[in-house]
UniProtKB/Swiss-Prot annotation:
GO CC, one annotated term: cytosol
Protein name, UniProt field: Shikimate dehydrogenase (NADP(+))
Entry GO MF terms: NADP binding; shikimate 3-dehydrogenase (NADP+) activity
Record: residues binding NADP(+): 82, 130-134, 218, 239
Organism taxonomic ancestry: Bacteria, Pseudomonadati, Nitrospirota, Thermodesulfovibrionia, Thermodesulfovibrionales
């Protein structure tokens, strides 16, 4: 039951209608008897500053930040965690009496989503598609775990910026897309939002994917490229695992309580079965 004391948590993004975050967080709040409510807000790029100001004005406890705001939101935040300083992208904000602090739980969310599937990162070659906020967190996580990173992005300057930012943490190289690249790759990661919309192009030509590849996608409604990878015979890791684990870390930041992982997992499985 929502009362005058209920703490509000939100998520800012565009598009946002597909998000499962309100469902899993509200189920977790209910299970633990916490007086919180999680709500989705469709925030356009030109309204982001006003939306962040509203966190303070409305005394919202915290929010998740998703595409396309993970990088641009930084300029409106008071304090940044060490990981955000290293990555340059925020996916979680905590409001502590009007002081907004940005965190990035995508890093550990991605690492644990692969570990859950028995996939080690150490000494593996990763092809990262994209060079936005999510890609930064994923690249940082892979390098932290001892993997090697190859980045393909349609705008080379963005990929170069990531290389310069993260080369001190490990091996990172920018590539053009052809078979000679994918032949040495162990894991392909789509770190773009391509696949969310019906008319989106595929981020990679499926002909370059082989059965021995692991294919990962940060998007959690199944994308056309995920279906192609499954058809080819790849092990496929969707965005659900990353969603679960980044949510668990964010949950603790807001509530100071350990997230009920199994309840959140069951909720996600029910939602996926329903779909």
């Amino acid at each position: 039951m929502i009362t005058g004391k209920t703490k509000i948590i939100g998520i800012f993004g565009d598009p946002i209608e597909h998000t499962l975050s309100p469902l899993i967080h509200n189920e977790a709040f209910s299970y633990l008897g916490l007086d919180y409510c999680y709500v989705a807000f469709n925030v356009k790029k030109d309204k982001l500053k006003e939306a962040v100001e509203a966190i303070r004005a409305l005394n919202i406890r915290g929010v998740n930040i998703t595409v396309p705001h993970k990088e641009t939101v930084i300029q409106y935040i008071d304090e940044l965690s060490d990981e955000v300083k290293n990555i340059g992208a925020v996916n979680t904000i905590l409001n502590n009496e009007g002081i907004l602090k940005g965190f990035n739980t995508d890093v550990n969310g991605f690492i644990l989503s692969l570990k859950d599937e028995g996939i080690s990162m150490k000494n593996k070659n990763f092809l990262i598609l994209g060079a936005g906020g999510a890609a930064k967190a994923i690249v940082y996580g892979i390098l932290k775990e001892g993997g090697k990173v190859y980045i393909y992005n349609r705008t080379p300057s963005n990929a170069l910026a990531i290389k310069e930012k993260f080369k001190k943490f490990g091996f990172i190289e920018i590539v053009e897309m052809d078979k000679s690249v994918t032949e040495k790759i162990d894991v392909i990661v789509n770190a773009t939002s391509l696949g969310l919309k019906k008319d989106d192009p595929m981020p990679l030509n499926p002909e370059l994917i082989k059965p021995e590849h692991v294919y990962c996608d940060i998007v959690y409604p199944e994308t056309p490229l995920m279906r192609e990878a499954e058809r080819i015979g790849c092990k496929v890791v969707g965005g659900i695992g990353m969603l679960l684990w980044q949510a668990a870390f964010a949950f603790k930041i807001w509530t100071e309580v350990e997230a009920p992982i199994e309840i959140m997992k069951k909720t996600l499985n029910k939602l996926l079965t329903k779909d």
